[in-house]
Amino acid sequence: MASRSAGTLITHNNATYIPPALMPGYRGHIPTASFTYGDTYGSTSARCFQDFRSTVLNSSRSPYCQGGQFPTGNASDPALVIGHRARGWDRFLHSPSWSRYNGDFKRAQELTQFHKAAEQHRDHYRDKSGSVHQVPHFIVPVKNPETFPLPQQVL
């Protein structure tokens, strides 16, 4: 008899049984956990998960949220709430300097400029009247002095 009519699993030790719905997702290898003789990896990780779950339930938030503090509409910290911030011109003085993504902004700006140039080139290509000017970036036969200027021409 492995299960009851209610669907709960009967184990030899019900105090350590954690229902799968309450168990957190895989959080990787636990290097801080010391494995003792006779203690399996599963029971040690289950103990670690249970400790993590109890700390989250006791504090009502994840202990891993001390990383990036991003403004939200609802937060336990009043300084993070967007409605708490200044609404006048002073809001630009304290504008955040962080970004949520690790991006190369100079490269993103170059790509934006290239996209605009490509759109202008497309407009020139579609133009039948000849009134739209060419984009110099896309003129293929480039003269040698434009690409490799002589040292006396650079001055």
UniProtKB/Swiss-Prot annotation:
Its main location: cytoplasm. One of its GO terms (cellular component) is axonemal microtubule. It is found in: Cytoplasm, Cytoskeleton, Cilium axoneme. Keywords: Cell projection, Cytoplasm, Cytoskeleton. PANTHER family: PROTEIN FAM166C (PTHR34924:SF1), UPF0573 PROTEIN C2ORF70 (PTHR34924). Belongs to the CIMIP2 family. Microtubule inner protein (MIP) part of the dynein-decorated doublet microtubules (DMTs) in cilia axoneme, which is required for motile cilia beating. This is Ciliary microtubule inner protein 2C. It comes from Xenopus tropicalis (Western clawed frog). The gene is cimip2c.
